């Protein structure tokens, strides 16, 4: 039997359990995750059509997949994951993230933070609020990030 710990530790345990992650993901999709993912994918298509927005299009599609099925996944920097720089993690990625932040990132993060606060009001919504916090962080600076499964603890 596990010792009781902090709320964050409990949520991390839930995310590491594949069955609970799947159940929470299904609830997430039904309660708005599908619409959020479709919004991110639409933004990705718009960015791709402009050609100039191609670097951000990839990020929108990654975030869209993450926002569709967030439990059991986490966003990490590709440099930390691979141990080397690539186009999105070097100086061009930094410029891309600054431009993204100025144009759209902070608006999207505010939206996710507002949703997180609304979820935190209820006990049942706390796991969903934590997912909105994860999405707010990646929405601020998505270039150079990737989504990977949470490691079992």
Give residue spans per PLM region:
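Juxtamembrane, membrane-proximal amphipathic segments and lipid-exposed surfaces
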Residues: 9-153
